[in-house]
Structure formats: C-alpha cells, structure tokens
Amino acid sequence: MRECISIHVGQAGVQIGNACWELYCLEHGIQPDGQMPSDKTIGGGDDSFNTFFSETGAGKHVPRAVFVDLEPTVVDEVRTGTYRQLFHPEQLITGKEDAASNYARGHYTIGKEIVDLVLDRIRKLADLCTGLQGFLIFHSFGGGTGSGFASLLMERLSVDYSKKSKLEFAIYPAPQVSTAVVEPYNSILTTHTTLEHSDCAFMVDNEAIYDICRRNLDIERPTYTNLNRLIGQIVSSITASLRFDGALNVDLTEFQTNLVPYPRIHFPLATYAPVISAEKAYHEQLSVAEITNACFEPANQMVKCDPRHGKYMACCMLYRGDVVPKDVNAAIATIKTKRTIQFVDWCPTGFKVGINYQPPTVVPGGDLAKVQRAVCMLSNTTAIAEAWARLVHKFDLMYAKWAFVHWYVGEGMEEGEFSEAREDLAALEKDCEEVGVDSVEAEAEEGEAY
C-alpha cells in the first residue's frame, strides 16, 4: 500500500482537516463512527481508501491523521463534534497555551515542549503503514502555531523520514483580509525554514477563496466553514487519485516529478472548476471543455496572482467524474492554441492529466452543487512571484521600523534570522523571474514578431 499521513497544525490546519475528513467519509461511505457498511473485508484489505484510513479488527476505519494545536479550543471542537468517534483520542494533540500569533513561540519556546509527543504519535501511525508514501501537512503561514510549529515539525520529519515526500497545503495570508498584524513576519520566517524541507506546497489564499464564494456561490458574507468546504473539495480532488482507482492515476511523487522543475520552485497554483451553486448548475451544461477553460481564468485561482503576467512551467489537470480522454485531449488542444496562455520555451509539452471516474461528492446542505464532472488544475507558474513580492513588501514596511521584533527576540530568536529569511525570499522571487526568461535565441525572434 502507498499510505499517506495527514498532519493538521494550528487552527487553520485543524479546521481544514475537519472539512477534508468530513468529505472523505462521505466519498467513501464511512459513517461518523468509522464503520463502513460497503466494505466487506474486515481489517486491512487492499482497497484504495486504505491509503488514508487504517482498519481495526472490529471493522472501524480510522483516519491516518494527527491534529495538533498549541491551545485546546479548536481541537476540543473535534473532540466533541460529529466525528468524535472517528478519531483515536491520541490523534488529537493539544498544548496548554497558544503561540499567540508568534512564530518564535511556535518554533522555539512552546513548540519544543510538544514536538516529541507529536513525533511519537506520527511514529505510531507510520508503524501501521506497510509502505508509507509521505506526509500531507496542513497549516497557515500567518498564525504562530501554523508557521512556527509546522516548520519545526517539518525539520524534524526530514531527520526521521528523510526519503518520504512532504507536501504542504498552506493558507497564504490574504492581501486584504488579515487575521494578525504580524502575518508577514510569520509567513516569511516559515517559508524560509520549510523551503528545503517541503517537496511541494499548494498555497491557498483566503481572499481568493472569499471572492470565489461571493462571486460563484452568491454567498454575501462567507464564513470559514464556507471557505474550508471549498478548500476541502480541492484537497479531495488532489488526493482522489490516491484514494480511488482511476484510469490515469497520479501518485504523490508523480506530482513532484511533473510540477517541480527546480527544487526551490515548488509552489503550484491550484484552480478548481466548476464552483457553482445548485440553482445555477441546474441551467448550465458543464462540458469538459468548459470546465477546462474555467481553470485558466485567474478568477478561479486559489491564490491572487495573474498567470497572464507569468509563464507556465508545468500543468497537471486532475479530472474526476464522467470524463473521457478524448474530450480532455480536445479541450487541452484548444487551450494550447490560445495566445494568452504562455509556456516557458524549455517546457513545450507541459500538461499531465489524471482521470478518476469517481464523481465529486458534495457535503449535504453545503453551498456547492452536485455536478457530474469537475477538474482541479495544479499549475506551476512564474506569476507566483507576485505573491512573494507582496509579502516581502509588507515585511519590509514593518521591519524598517523594527516593529514587533521584540516579541520574537524575547522568545529566543536572533535578529539575524529576520534578514536571512527576507534574503531567502527575495532570492526565491528572483528565481521565479529568471526561470521565466526565455533562452537567448527566443528573445531575438520575439523582437521581430512584434
């Protein structure tokens, strides 16, 4: 088996975890108490969903997941919620005091006390796997636990499981909607620390998701539940190929192979289509061509940046539902003829396709319509540099005035770490830009073409 262990860190990670596991259970027909009436093999079995769930002798399915937060309130909601019987109590780990939006508290002072316990739990989960494939780590960039503790944990995982892939789902601080003043500090420190430990990081920007909820689902004031359910759909699309049998299946390591041209440039954009409310879906025919086109609309992206200003390095299309390869090839051929979508000249083919026959499931009473087919596009584009540039700019504004720095230094950080992290991100931004520059011959030709 190729098992995956999900690690949900901090409030954002835990709440997205709730949305994801709720959806996985619906998709696989697993009840909130872990029983699965459709599953005939008791204990183990080689079903695809066993990559995400382990089975006990009593036929109960337990998620291969750990929920960690440095303060108890958010995880307590899982302990008392609908799915409380699904998780083993030891999978829900909480500390006593929170990281107070402070990277240094999550990474140095408070995180240190709990990290060995967490690694011990992860070790127990890993022991239940026959062929552990890797880790999926869910966290936010802006929070103290999400930034500090997640990066500490990833450093330690690199030591203990050096050969296993680590994929992140990270909540990028939204340009407008800010939950903490020090988000730029936390984001830049955590990106710097995890850059060499993460193999692939899917970023999700709250503001982009807000806009999608407002525009496509007509929700005037989206709540975190609305946002998380949409993020859950995306995570589910990305992991569907690991949990179901499909025609063209995509493995965790295959993502990396196809999406990451250089080790540092491992931040693909996710785009999901169709995001549509039930009353609209009733009147629309969402063909493969239409949903494929929708993926190239900047409005449907999960991070605010404009791919039309950058170039695509690689592109993964993950279809699910009633989709046949013939339609996909036609849709992609059409996309390639469009001038607006530019690929870097050293990567001419650039499309990888996965098809999964399991149609998308929706949470009953949720906002999304039940559709026959959906697609999730993961694209590595140089436009992501815009997102880093925004962060670095905000970081500079505060750091120039040395604002809030004492909170970090007081928790045992050194001032040098700030400038070091800032340099690293500036370099990352530069890397993205350089990759997009054409080879010399191409530049001469372009001059003539215009």
UniProtKB/Swiss-Prot annotation:
GO terms for biological process: microtubule cytoskeleton organization; mitotic cell cycle. Some glutamate residues at the C-terminus are polyglutamylated, resulting in polyglutamate chains on the gamma-carboxyl group. Polyglutamylation plays a key role in microtubule severing by spastin (SPAST). SPAST preferentially recognizes and acts on microtubules decorated with short polyglutamate tails: severing activity by SPAST increases as the number of glutamates per tubulin rises from one to eight, but decreases beyond this glutamylation threshold. Glutamylation is also involved in cilia motility. GO terms for cellular component: cilium; cytoplasm; microtubule; microtubule cytoskeleton; nucleus. It catalyses: GTP + H2O = GDP + phosphate + H(+). GTP binds at residues 11, 71, 140, 144-145, 179, 206, 228. Keywords: Acetylation, Cytoplasm, Cytoskeleton, GTP-binding, Hydrolase, Magnesium, Metal-binding, Methylation, Microtubule, Nitration, Nucleotide-binding, Phosphoprotein. InterPro entries: Alpha_tubulin, Tub_FtsZ_C, Tubulin, Tubulin/FtsZ-like_C, Tubulin/FtsZ_2-layer-sand-dom, Tubulin/FtsZ_GTPase_sf, Tubulin_C, Tubulin_CS. Signal peptide: none annotated. Its main location: cytoplasm. The modification Phosphoserine is found at residue 439. Tubulin is the major constituent of microtubules, a cylinder consisting of laterally associated linear protofilaments composed of alpha- and beta-tubulin heterodimers. Microtubules grow by the addition of GTP-tubulin dimers to the microtubule end, where a stabilizing cap forms. Below the cap, tubulin dimers are in GDP-bound state, owing to GTPase activity of alpha-tubulin. Belongs to the tubulin family. The MREC motif may be critical for tubulin autoregulation. This is Tubulin alpha-3E chain. It comes from Homo sapiens. The lineage of its organism: Eukaryota, Metazoa, Chordata, Craniata, Vertebrata. The gene is TUBA3E.
